[in-house]
Amino acid sequence: MPSYRTFSFGLAALFLSACAPLHQKTYLPNDPGIAWQERQAQLRQLTSWHIIGRASIAQDKKAWNAGVNWYENAGVYRIKMMGPFSQGGFHLDGTPEQVILTLSDGQTTSSSSPEALLNKTFNLNLPITALRDWLKGLPYAGDAPYENIEIDNHGRLKYLEQLRWKIYYQQYKRYGQQQLPSKLFMSHPELKVRLVVDNWKYEQ
C-alpha cells in the first residue's frame, strides 16, 4: 500500500508539471514586443557607423543607380553617391549646423538642410535626415510620429509609414552583434528608392 509521503510527492510533481506550461507562456523570452523594445534601445546607441551599398532611385520616367558610402560619427556625417547619378555623383558633408554639397566637378553649395540641397540641385526629395534612423531599422526620432509600423517575429522593423514614406524592410543580415537591414524598398508619392547594403561597420 503506498505511503502518505509517496502520495504527497506524486501530487506535488503532478501540480508542478501542470503549472510549467503556464509559467513558460507567461514569461516568453522571445516575445517580439519585448525584443523590439530592447532592440530600439541598442540601435539608438549606434552613433558611429559606416555602410557600403547601392541605390536605385526612380522619379517620374527617370531613374538613377549609384554606389553609396555613408559615414556617421556622433551627428557628423559624409554621404558619397557615386556612379551615373545625374551630374556624375556628389557627396554631402553634414553637421548639426550646416550641410555642404559637393558635385563631381568640385562645385559646392551649402544649407542647413540636406533635403533642401538635394531638392534644389537635383529636384529630388530624399529624406536624408530620417534615413539616418531608417537605415538602422528604426523609426525617425525627430518630430514626426509614424502612421503605421509592423514588427516581425524577431522584434525587427518590418514595415514603417512615416513622413509620407512607406519603408519595407526586405532582408536583415548579422553584422557583429546586431542584425541590421541589408535590403530596403522605400515608396513615396513622388519617388521610389531601393537600397542594398553590402556591408555594415559600426563601433560597439
Task: Mark where each language-model region is.
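Beta-strand-dominated lipid-handling architectures at cellular/organellar boundaries
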Residues: 52, 64-66, 71, 76, ...
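C-terminal motif of bacterial Sec signal peptides marking the signal peptidase cleavage site
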Residues: 15-18
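Gly/Pro-enriched, hydrophobic low-complexity segments
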Residues: 137-204
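An acidic-aromatic
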Residues: 76-125
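Bacterial N-terminal signal peptides that target proteins for export
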Residues: 1-8
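Bacterial signal peptide processing site
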Residues: 20-23
